[in-house]
Amino acid sequence: MRRRRRNRSPFPCGQPWTHVNSGITIPAALDELPRVRATSFAAPELDISQNFASEDGRESLTIQIFRNTNGSVPVWFAQAERAILLRADLKNPVLAVPVTAFTPPGQSAASGLKAVFAPEEVEGIRSTGVALFVVGDWYVKLRANSASLIPSDMSGWMEGVIAELTLPAGSAPAAAPIADCAARLDFPDTSADSTLPAAMLTAGVKDAAARIESPRWCLDRVVRGNQAVYRPDGASDRYLFAAGDSGKAFAVQPHGAAATRYHSINFLTADRTFTLPAQAALPPPQRLLDLAAAKRSVAASKTWPTP
């Protein structure tokens, strides 16, 4: 699978910038912090970030917009939280303001999530926060650091910063912090490719499978680092294996019935879907990693531009 490459993205100095795909406009400065860098991770503007900072570096903000190809706000917020906890320089920060839902500008439901952490004995960072919400087909993530704000003030500051964005009209479902699944998935002792004839391996193999949809997701397990398994609450035959905190994930789901049943594996990125060999039964997460490491992709389909 492709590595995430960073490219400096041109932006109008001192001018607002509009994300062409979503219509979101980001000002040249957020709460008087000037834009200092813009980065593109996947063209054309499928995964971008912009950084804002005070001259002395005591306050900083990062806005990231990445394509919504899978999961939900609770899923990708949980990944963003874990990314903070895994940062060695933050020294296992304490959750100071628990995960709270908020209503993004122009939306009617509390469809966004935010949280604030308080690093201990970390020079230059008194509080660090994250907020995430969805605008149509795009996730919007805010990261904020401050050397002066206490956690409760950081929480309010983030909402104030988000209010400075110009967002297109739209709606999104209410969000709630993700919870652990009631029971963990039970995987077979061995994993193997499906032995069905190639003609029967269509959905999710020859072509990308349909998106796994669910009004409510739960956390099945953290595999390691910021790799975690989520699934529709109550489902036992499918899951999403999130890799990192920017939208990349493996989607595993069943197809067919009885003797013709198999499980597809799709690796979802910002602009395409890679299909891996069909599996005879529900594969454990390590099987996905092994197949990806062995570069056993059988097909790739572009998902951008959308049909």
Q: How should these model regions be labeled?
A:
Residues E45-S49, S60, E123-G129:
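Short, surface-exposed coil-to-beta transition loops
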Residues K91-L132:
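Signature of long, low-cysteine stretches enriched in small and polar/charged residues
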Residues I48-A80, M200-A203, A210-R211, D220-G256, ...:
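A short acidic-to-branched-hydrophobic micro-motif
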Residues E32-V36, E45-Q50, Q107-A118:
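Short, hydrophobic/aromatic-rich segments at coil-to-beta transitions
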Residues R231-P307:
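Extended, charged low-complexity segments
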Residues G71-A101:
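Mid-length scaffold segments of soluble, non-membrane domains
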Residues L61-Q64, D137-A147:
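Short, well-ordered beta-strand elements
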Residues L142-D193, L288-S301:
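Surface-exposed amphipathic alpha-helical segments
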